Each structure stands twice: as structure tokens, then as C-alpha cells.
Amino acid sequence: MPRKGPAPKRPLINDPVYGSPLVTQLVNKILLDGKKSTAERIVYEALEQAREKTGTDPVVTLKRALDNVKPALEVRSRRVGGATYQVPVEVRPGRSTTLALRWLVTFSRQRREKTMVERLANELLDASNGLGAAVKRREDTHKMAEANKAFAHYRW
């Protein structure tokens, strides 16, 4: 294991079209096989579709979707005397954003629409309205934490 501690966080460059670091993070989550220009095209077209359907700024829609998907609690496995407990812990802000983006992209890929642009746009719109699979994942995560509240004293 390295002894110098964790690598320093690299600053996120604001995205050139919307000037938002969240859009940059979304592009990086969509990215497959190093094809960044393809990922950017998918994200920008999806945000444009979201703008056409809602008539509002797509970055606002993205932020609203993220706020509806970000988990406040999650469970972590903790081994105590031969038994493994699911211990509920609070999620740090950076991790909650990362999880929300990951869930949005994962569930966009599982949707049935024809193109990835449509899938991502519709998942974003659903999430911003409090619907969709990504929001359900957040609710399930919170339910797990609530169900295991008895083990909260094992937090570290």
C-alpha cells in the first residue's frame, strides 16, 4: 500500500458548452472506450432534448434530477465477531453526487428507448420529476439504511 496517503483530487474543468462541472462529470460517466467526443455528443444532445421538452435550462433540470437521486444514507458491511452487519452511514457530498450520476447513467443504459440520447434525456426528466429507476434505487438504499438502523452504533 502507498504510504503517501490518497492522491490529491484533480480539479474538474468546467464544460465548454454549459460551463458546469456537473456536465463534465456526466460526460466522464457516459464515457466508454475513451470515446470522449461521442460521450459529449450524447450528453449535449440529451440536454438539448430535455430543454425542448421542459422549456427550462437543462443544467437546472440536471441539478434537480441529481437532488432527487442523491442518497443521504447508505449501508456498509462491518464485520464484528464473525458476523457481518450492514451498518448505515451518512454519504459524503462528493460520493452522493458520484453515486447519483452513476445510477442515472446505469439506468439510462437499461431503458428501452432506441438511442442513448433519448434514454439519457428521458431518465433525466423522470428523475427531475421524482420518477424513474434511479430515484427508486435511492429509495431502496434509504430503506436498507432504515431497516438496519439497529446496527448504527457499529459506525466507524
From Swiss-Prot:
It comes from Rhodococcus jostii (strain RHA1). InterPro entries: Ribosomal_uS7, Ribosomal_uS7_bac/org-type, Ribosomal_uS7_CS, Ribosomal_uS7_dom, Ribosomal_uS7_dom_sf. GO terms for molecular function: rRNA binding; structural constituent of ribosome; tRNA binding. Belongs to the universal ribosomal protein uS7 family. PANTHER family: RIBOSOMAL PROTEIN S7. The lineage of its organism: Bacteria, Bacillati, Actinomycetota, Actinomycetes, Mycobacteriales. Part of the 30S ribosomal subunit. Contacts proteins S9 and S11. Gene3D superfamilies: Ribosomal protein S7 domain. It comes from the Bacteria. GO terms for biological process: translation. GO terms for cellular component: small ribosomal subunit. One of the primary rRNA binding proteins, it binds directly to 16S rRNA where it nucleates assembly of the head domain of the 30S subunit. Is located at the subunit interface close to the decoding center, probably blocks exit of the E-site tRNA. This is Small ribosomal subunit protein uS7.
